[in-house]
Amino acid sequence: MNIDVGRQSNGQGHETVHAGFPADQSGLSADRIQMFCSDRGRNAQGDDTSGPGSAAIRANAPRAAVDRMIAAFTSFLAQEMGVAEDVVEFDGETFWAPGSNLTPTMLEAMEMARAQGRTDLQRHAARAGLPDSSLPDGANISEIVIDPEAGQTDQVRYTVVDDFGNLINLMSAEGQVNGGAAQGLEQTMLERVVFDAEGRLLTVSFLGCALPRASRVPMIGITTEPVPLAQNQLGMNGSGEAGAAGAPVAVANAVQDRGIRQVDMPFTPSRIWEVLRDVSEAAEQ
């Protein structure tokens, strides 16, 4: 089975995630399913991955297409079995009907249709529109230690609890949260673009900008508390932006807990040291 979806995978694991439900629905093993993501040579419609909508929107389309495929083969096999269409059942592994000894799997049904030249059973398409709403929820907890003498801020523990609705693949969801949180933490602590007085760019590489560093990102504790969403068939919410969106706010609140009322990101040692000095001087007056 080839599955074409109109969204490009850039490391999010669409080829694994989007194939999961069709495999379960059709009874085909994973090695029988091949994913094509936003391939304009095969599908005229497609775009990149942006926003947390790939699962909540796009995953419903392959599911609907497989439902149509099952319905089409049910009709085809009813004729082969010599029974009424409404008595043919597909139990996730085989088609069957009372009074018939014919019990083909989905793959066997496909081979039967091909042998009879039924090309109309080779392609099944479906659209998935935007859900009425997507309501992911969660909490990010940042625990930091600030060295007042140097202004150094160290992230010692980071905990995330998220509700993304039903999860297709827990490992993929946790990976996105992990990577997003690492990006958000580094954005909060170091990421910036600096120009000199003449407008020349000083942060000309990722060493200065900067990319997340493993030494600065703690082990991130992730817990999921899924509540199925009623607005789409699969009960899923988006998850792609959760880690990156929650981290800056959590760290900023942790910094404020030190008595710092206002400081612009990134929270570099020099900025934190200057603000702590001002706080100390104000307290002495």
Language-model-derived ranges and their functions:
Residues 1-285:
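Cofactor-binding beta-sheet edge motifs in enzyme active sites
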